Amino acid sequence: MKKVEKQEQVFYRKYRPQIFKEVIGEDHIVKVLEGAIKLGNISHAYLFSGARGTGKTSVARILSRELGTNASDLYEMDAASNRGIDDIRSIRESVSTLPFESKFKVYIIDEVHMLTKDAWNAFLKTLEEPPAHVVFILATTEIEKVPETVVSRCQTFVFRAPNQKVLKEFVVNIAKKEGFVLAPDAVELVAILGDGSFRDTHGILEKVLSSTTDKKITREEVEAVTGAPKSKLVKDILESVVLQDLPKGLSAVGQASTSNADMKLFTKLILERLRFLFLLRLKTGMDEHIKEEVSEDDFEFLTDLASKAGQSMTGSVLLRFIQAYEDTGRTTIPELALELALTDVIK
């Protein structure tokens, strides 16, 4: 892959949604917020909860714009680094003054669960009797750490992590805007590496696209750039399970380990393919769906292997590898969980 100049603007900023209709996968939240704005039912405090990279801060900024708040009346604070009582006192002093040129002063506080106990106590007093011209938007990845007395005074929205289908569409659309086309299995790998985060998916895709002048990108190129386990090793594991070839399976695990592959990711990739193999063996009628998810060569490989799979490919096999995925990383030997799974399913 040939190196090219770095993009002028990082993807997660370049493609950050600017209006509600650009927000992906959070229709349940957008609909409520749009309705509230239309009716003029504005809450004095919102609490956005969800995993990292799901769009909480982006939606907070969109909401502030939809409320007609200009930059001079928008205040953002990261509670991870501004978590003390003095930081909250400065907010309490600020809220008493009227907006410069907007109807509302909006305060976006990210990672709000990081506030200290004293800071929470001080902030609660402001939440109990907020000025009419102030709107707080709190964002957190750990809502269980937010005091119930605060949660009860906020309108709470839970952001859902995007599923694989949403992330794959997301990858395809951004790649298209950048003038690239990714093979289906390359799209799948980028989405898997994104791990339920739009921001992480942005970063991985940017890394891939900025490393090549090729307009058509294969899975192998994504593997080379990201250091993901090679698809051949995943195929070797599948064959070892179906054909009951333990040495082949253990060899694949060993090769992945030697290349410093992330065993959690390796097991996840194996699970993705085992599921497809299982569905093909059962003749569930999902052939077309699976064909859209993988490359033509991979679909041919899976179809052929499924025809050879009897009782060696059952639901219990999938369950055993799910357990291996959950167990990976619990010991100082990363590959152990996968090795044990293979010895259990290959008799």
Regions found by a protein language model. Name each.
Residues 54, 60, 87-90, 139, ...:
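Extended, largely alpha-helical regulatory/partner-binding modules appended to the mid-to-C-terminal parts
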